[in-house]
């Protein structure tokens, strides 16, 4: 028998709650400032504690995967920017790398180095936004301002390369669209020299702060077993004691040539996740410094020599008839990978970002699936919020670092 909505026994579409004496139903979001977009949580409270949590998603659903089936592979690249719009280069790369794997395209070394630079700058930018918003959720306003100050330097570097600050479209199938501008590496090195002291400033303000520790330590604990069974990845997995990083486990680009550590913790609480984000930013700086030295000794090619799938350089298109015709065909008809299916996983700032492509040999994917880390980290709220105080819900959500563009797609 259908239930009529009333004030005593709330009714929620698609959700069923047994209203027991002394329990209260609380809607958290989707307009709440700590909801990280359009997240809605229906919480059942017993006093101050959460006894049941139900995430309700879909408010940002745009049908991205279905859009891919009606676009050419090149046309879909800007759409990937809008999945995790805080780390758009990571999405660009994962999609392009999946197509390259399907087509057996070999990317030039310099293009690989530039890609790593963009990915690690993107990682720093994403981590700084996490730190700023997480601190603001808990009440540390000054850290929010400091983190955004440094994030501006990162966005300026990315903007000088590709012209965009948020949705980059900075990676192409077969390589990258541009070489680094003059003086860009010098500016990057200046940032790398300064940024570790900025991280120290954040740590001085937060790590030993009694209020910060009281709000995060032993709050939102995710055990190793729960992290594995729930499909967690990235910092969410490493904070629970599993040091898995795809850049180390299944290296891509030039990551197997780079020296960097994979920080991990064992406690699995909000504080452990915060510490890992701080340590990861230091590792990003180490990677960027190594990339600059490797870039300076690399050959100038930035796009693959694969005429069947990739356009020639602009100079060749403007001077050679064959290159012009091949470019015209690729733009008007799109590249056509061989029939088959492929899955490619990369380590995005938030965890494992995977792209599955099923190709029927046409210029559009027969099926495309995006495996986003935020979707799985959002689903775990049903377990990790139970038993927590309602005042800690915002801090727990912030520590998982989800983006609703990834959750809903």
Swiss-Prot record:
Predominant place of localization: membrane
E.C. number: 7.1.1.-
Disulfide bonding pattern of the chain: none
Membrane topology summary: Peripheral membrane protein
Coiled-coil stretches noted in the UniProt entry, renumbered to this chain: none
Native species: Campylobacter concisus (strain 13826)
Annotated family: Belongs to the complex I 49 kDa subunit family.
Transport recorded as keyword: yes
Reaction catalysis annotation: a quinone + NADH + 5 H(+)(in) = a quinol + NAD(+) + 4 H(+)(out)
PANTHER family to which the protein is assigned, alphabetical: NADH DEHYDROGENASE [UBIQUINONE] IRON-SULFUR PROTEIN 2, MITOCHONDRIAL, NADH-UBIQUINONE OXIDOREDUCTASE 49 KDA SUBUNIT
Gene Ontology molecular-function annotations: NAD binding; NADH:ubiquinone reductase (non-electrogenic) activity; quinone binding
The protein, known as: NADH-quinone oxidoreductase subunit D
